[in-house]
Amino acid sequence: MNRDSFYPAIACFPLLLMLAGCAPMHETRQALSQQTPAAQVDTALPTALKNGWPDSQWWLEYHDNQLTSLINNALQNAPDMQVAEQRIQLAEAQAKAVATQDGPQIDFSADMERQKMSAEGLMGPFALNDPAAGTTGPWYTNGTFGLTAGWHLDIWGKNRAEVTARLGTVKARAAEREQTRQLLAGSVARLYWEWQTQAALNTVLQQIEKEQNTIIATDRQLYQNGITSSVEGVETDINASKTRQQLNDVAGKMKIIEARLIALTNHQTKSLTLKPVALPKVASQLPDELGYSLLARRADLQAAHWYVESSLSTIDAAKAAFYPDINLMAFLQQDALHLSDLFRHSAQQMGVTAGLTLPIFDSGRLNANLDIAKAESNLSIASYNKAVVEAVNDVARAASQVQTLAEKNQHQAQIERDALRVVGLAQARFNAGIIAGSRVSEARIPALRERANGLLLQGQWLDASIQLTGALGGGYKR
């Protein structure tokens, strides 16, 4: 070894000695791996439905001002959104608090003390009044003021890892806010279209009740004329009572939905006025392939991902705690026993201090903290993997439901057309004078019943379409 390489080796020896003297780090837990969804999720939907990812404001496709207003009000005033926003602000403040520990700190301090020295204590000579010896005791008024600086050197990256962990939490909270936003929008839209479905069903039931009343009036007239017996009108009366009961049930459901909408949108009035509109037929959106794209379009998956990243940085910070901790301190002050001497140049004092903390034996505290960080990280990864599996299953389940309901709607549409043909035949026979008008009403009631069934199926299809939109991320994009 030559002289040029000998001196650097000697200089590094104390550092190597310090590192060797640190508390030993034990690897007791194995990290889990993050799961990714399959490259493709086969939904077996018609090609017409595979027309891309939903838009971030997918509810605008309904072209319904009432719905848009309700969702905008919910996103602006709902308590859930306020909670999500405050969680982000809290995480940002915590990240800033950790980041400030990585820089130098400078403080100014000043103090004044009036004290009487004890002649029997350690400072006994200062209790004497001997100007020749420089003492003017026993009373002194001493003062100190000046600057104090400190700097914790983050050589091993502990503070940087903690800041990264906090920033990961901020990003996770932001993704959770978007998830809350989509859940709110989806909940409001589902309730709104459920209300519209019940409103349309109410109209059909009123038409059924009208036809039943026509039949009842005809039967009563025939009975009064002695043409029929009273027994023939009993079944119609029972059916009319059932229809009235259904109307009451529908009215109750509509009021419950209105109350839930008021709660979701944080509406300030006790009642909510909605106008009935026709149920739309909006094509559900489903891309041909999901795979990795689903990870970037589901806010809940992004939140879980950032919690994993945050936990990994927490592990780095826990590992850095095993290494020496170095602090620098400096002060520049004026210090005097008498206030009259405080501003003299001779009262100035200054100094620099370098501190080193070396963890040698800590009864396993550092390893316990590291185990906690690793366990929390594995828990975050396991939660992420679970969320990935559930996300893929949500899409597959919602897509299958949309397909099934689409087929049911097609079959129901054919049933309604057949029922209308029966009504047309009855109307033609009535126009020809072959049957009475009550027989036309009897033919209309089954057709109206099928129309009611069709409305319920259409409402279910709309609800499933909104659930599919939510399963696809609701337009969220990283």
Swiss-Prot record:
Keywords: Antibiotic resistance, Cell outer membrane, Lipoprotein, Membrane, Palmitate, Signal, Transmembrane, Transmembrane beta strand. GO terms for cellular component: cell outer membrane. Pfam families: OEP (PF02321). Coiled coil: none annotated. It is a lipid-anchor. A lipid is attached at residue 22 (S-diacylglycerol cysteine). It is found in: Cell outer membrane. The keyword Lipoprotein applies. Could be involved in resistance to puromycin, acriflavine and tetraphenylarsonium chloride. NCBIfam families: outer_NodT (TIGR01845), PRK11459.1 (NF008524). This is Multidrug resistance outer membrane protein MdtQ. It comes from Escherichia coli O157:H7. The gene is mdtQ.
